[in-house]
Design a protein with these regions (language model features):
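Acyl-donor (CoA/ACP) binding surface of acyl/acetyltransferases
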Residues: 1-35, 68-192
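Short gly/ser-rich anion-binding loops that grip negatively charged ligand groups
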Residues: 42, 46, 65, 72
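Conserved GNAT-fold acetyl-CoA-binding loop/helix
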Residues: 34-57
Length: 192
């Protein structure tokens, strides 16, 4: 991934790679968050500055693995979209929006923009989401961004309540996916 990547979301919003220097923005963005961290092994609720730096170091796009794009309005971080490589030809996408910014369509626009960029810019044919079955807003984001339900996996998603996976709790996840249109076989549908 190019660290200088910027994707325009319209209405003054843009996506760009989050880097170590964005730790303060991440702390500010999560200051009112009571839910678990954005994703991965970070503490519940707000990030401290050391937690934010550790998370951003893990999401370094130069490392070639997982990375995160921030949704920004000027210099205010409104949310983030993470892309985590999976098996060859696929990647998981995760997203988070500040509570005060939810319900404005920001997540749908950001997910759609990163999905299209991942298909075209990174040549990843399949992008998938893991969604808690009770997370209705996230399910609406998936639908609005053009994702399709694939399956329900029992006890597949980790809660990250503890650092040790053996002692953590796990919950069911709904898998939604988006396949790059040029890789889908055309289906002839009779005219009705």
């Amino acid at each position: 991934m190019r660290p200088d990547l910027t994707l325009d979301l319209g209405n003054g919003l843009h996506l760009r790679a989050l880097v170590l220097d964005d730790a303060v923005l991440l702390v500010q963005a999560t200051s009112g968050e009571a839910a678990p961290s954005l994703w991965g092994p970070r503490p519940a609720g707000p990030y401290s500055l050391p937690d934010a730096r550790a998370a951003l170091a893990e999401w370094d796009p130069a490392a070639g693995g997982q990375f995160s794009l921030g949704v920004l309005d000027g210099q205010q971080l409104l949310g983030a979209v993470g892309l985590m490589p999976g098996q060859p030809g696929s990647a998981e996408l995760a997203y988070w929006i500040r509570p005060a910014q939810r319900g404005r369509g920001i997540a749908s626009r950001a997910v759609q923009a990163v999905t299209i960029w991942a298909h075209r810019g990174l040549a990843i044919p399949r992008i998938w989401l893991e969604i808690d079955p009770g997370n209705e807003p996230s399910l609406r984001v998936a639908q609005r961004a053009g994702y399709h339900f694939e399956q329900r996996l029992p006890r597949h998603c980790r809660d990250w309540a503890t650092e040790d996976a053996r002692h953590d709790s796990w919950h069911d996840c709904l898998i939604w996916s988006h396949v790059e249109p040029s890789t889908i076989e055309p289906v002839l549908v009779p005219w009705r």
